[in-house]
Design a protein with these regions (language model features):
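A generic "binding-loop/recognition-motif" signal
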Residues: 12, 58, 100-101
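C-terminal "cap" of GNAT-fold acetyltransferases
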Residues: 118-146
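Conserved GNAT acetyl-CoA-binding A-motif
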Residues: 87-100
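Conserved beta-strand in the GNAT
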Residues: 39, 45-54, 59-66
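Conserved active-site alpha-helix within GNAT-family acetyltransferase domains
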Residues: 99-127
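Conserved acetyl-CoA-binding loop-helix of GNAT-fold acetyltransferases
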Residues: 67, 73-86
Length: 146
């Protein structure tokens, strides 16, 4: 059972931009096409965080997972990630780039992959082709083939 539910928001949502900026996450490509963003709402209707995904052909880039500071330490990041992954077609490979959260994502089933093993459509995203540093860790969700 999840502690949160997702509500769609646009890339131009000012609270989304503020939350990402405050956490040091990129905001420059939020309004580009192919992106979907969500506000994580608790049972009392309060916003606890935000998440996003980007379509890359048949694959998906998980991006912008952020829990607001006052809600951290309650395992909501895992709930938010799991709920966001439910929006992705089970046949899609899910990738992400991180500079600091690899252990967190490993706990959710992601494994480190080499850039050479990442599909061209994912590598061509603004996130992986220029916004994230080349030193970012690239990860893929390790799930059974469908």
């Amino acid at each position: 059972m999840s502690d949160i539910r997702l509500e769609p928001v646009t890339g131009s949502d000012p609270e989304l931009k503020l939350a990402l900026s405050a956490s040091g996450l990129p905001t420059e490509d939020l309004e580009d096409t192919g992106r979907s963003f969500f506000k994580a709402v608790s049972s009392d209707r309060g916003t606890v965080g935000y998440a996003g995904i980007e379509a890359c052909g048949d694959d998906v880039l998980l991006r912008s997972i952020v829990i607001l500071p006052e809600h951290r330490g309650k395992a909501l990041g895992k709930s938010l990630t799991r709920e966001t992954l439910k929006t992705v077609n089970v046949s899609s490979a899910v990738f992400l780039a991180t500079t600091s959260a690899a252990p967190f994502f490993e706990s959710l089933g992601f494994v480190v992959v080499e850039r050479a093993d990442v599909p061209p459509a994912v590598l061509a995203t603004r996130q992986l082709s220029g916004i994230c540093p080349a030193s970012a860790t690239i990860m893929k969700l390790d799930r059974a083939p469908t």
